[in-house]
């Protein structure tokens, strides 16, 4: 399945496809 967003993005960057940084956690686009 799809990888859920939820990584931290203290650098302002999300590496999970389809996710964007909603500091400090990546959220779905």
Curated annotation (Swiss-Prot):
A Pfam family that the UniProt record links to this protein: Cyclotide
Say which family it is in.
Belongs to the cyclotide family. Moebius subfamily.
According to UniProt, the name of this protein is Cycloviolacin-O15
What's written under domain?
Answer: The presence of a 'disulfide through disulfide knot' structurally defines this protein as a knottin.
Instruction: Describe PTMs of this protein.
Output: This is a cyclic peptide.
**Which of UniProt's keywords are assigned here?**
Cytolysis, Disulfide bond, Hemolysis, Knottin, Plant defense
Q: Which InterPro entries match?
A: Cyclotide, Cyclotide_moebius_CS, Cyclotide_sf
Keyword Mitochondrion attached: no
Its biological function?
Answer: Probably participates in a plant defense mechanism. Has hemolytic activity.
Q: Which organism is it from?
A: Viola odorata (Sweet violet)
Its Gene Ontology biological processes? Answer: defense response; killing of cells of another organism
Disulphide bond pairs = 5-19, 9-21, 14-26
């Amino acid at each position: 399945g799809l990888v859920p967003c939820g990584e931290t993005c203290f650098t302002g960057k999300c590496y999970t496809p389809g996710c964007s940084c909603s500091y400090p956690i990546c959220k779905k686009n």
